[in-house]
From Swiss-Prot:
This is Eukaryotic translation initiation factor 3 subunit G-1. Belongs to the eIF-3 subunit G family. It comes from Drosophila mojavensis. InterPro entries: eIF3_g, eIF3g_N, eIF3G_RRM, Nucleotide-bd_a/b_plait_sf, RBD_domain_sf, RRM_dom. It is found in: Cytoplasm. GO terms for cellular component: eukaryotic 43S preinitiation complex; eukaryotic 48S preinitiation complex; eukaryotic translation initiation factor 3 complex. One of its GO terms (molecular function) is translation initiation factor activity. Its main location: cytoplasm.
């Protein structure tokens, strides 16, 4: 009688005969690794066995994170083990957050600390530099400056009696001259105050030479140090130029200081 030939079956056939369906997922831990075995159907409707290997490592986390991992799961994940389930949970990309304190925010928003902001402003071209250093001096850009000078001279001649302010007698009638006892004409003289100690005669001439011709300039200096005492006198040849100088330079920023320009008061005889 011939012997019966035995045919070896595959593990998939054995699993199908034993369980008649998909076996449950199993997990085993050996030598610092976790092996997860699960069964599923592939595209051809055949049972497949998938084994995933995880390396176990210890990680120091904040207390709040460790406490959150001990929360009881609910819903469809009620019977899942601690940690994310690969079938229901997908880990997205890691986001790194950087926290700034309030002092750094205030420092970043401080406009005075902005290196791109310049405190200087030119009166000729509105650039970020002083008017004395303007590259457009003497060009067509000076047209606006000359118009201001003419308007200031006209307002000084017409509107001065209507302002209601005190006007010195030597300024009430420009046609009478204004010659003092010493023969000096002070009607076209102005006083410039709040000058820096580093001010020189060349700087003073550069400041007023575009306004009109001058007959004399005096920069007050300290006898001991030779530094500027903070004020100067400029005598223009025409009174309208002096009025224009007051209109243009009064309140003008120069060398980090705000200039104060007014009519020069005559000396007492």
């Amino acid at each position: 009688m011939p012997g019966v030939e035995t045919i070896k079956s595959s593990w998939a056939d054995e699993v199908e005969l034993d369980y008649g369906g998909l076996p449950p997922t199993t997990e085993t831990i050996e030598n610092g690794h976790k092996y997860v075995t699960e069964y599923k159907y592939n595209k051809d409707d055949k049972k497949t066995k998938v084994v995933r290997t995880y390396k176990i490592s210890k990680q120091v986390v904040p207390k709040t994170v460790a406490k959150r991992r001990t929360w009881t799961k609910f819903g469809d994940s009620k019977n899942d083990k601690p940690g994310p389930n690969s079938q229901t949970t997908m880990v997205s990309e890691e986001i790194i957050m950087q926290f700034l304190n309030s002092k750094e925010d205030e420092k970043a928003n401080d406009p005075l600390l902005d290196p791109t902001k310049n405190i200087a402003k030119c009166r000729i071209c509105n650039g970020e530099h002083w008017s004395v250093n303007c590259p457009y001096k003497g060009t067509a850009m000076d047209t606006n400056l000359m118009e201001k000078k003419a308007a200031a001279a006209a307002s000084a001649a017409v509107d001065a009696p209507k302002s209601g302010k005190y006007v010195p007698p030597f300024l009430k009638d420009s046609q009478k001259g204004g010659m003092g006892m010493r023969g000096r004409d002070d009607t076209a003289a102005i006083r410039i105050s709040n000058l820096s100690e580093s001010m020189t005669e060349a700087d003073l001439e550069e400041l007023v030479k575009k306004i009109g011709p001058q007959s004399k300039m005096y920069l007050a200096r300290d006898k001991n140090t030779g530094l500027c005492k903070g004020f100067a006198y400029v005598h223009f040849k025409q009174r309208k130029d002096a009025a224009a100088a007051i209109e243009i330079l009064n309140g003008h920023g120069y060398d980090h200081l705000i200039l104060s320009v007014e009519w020069s008061k005559p000396q007492n005889n």
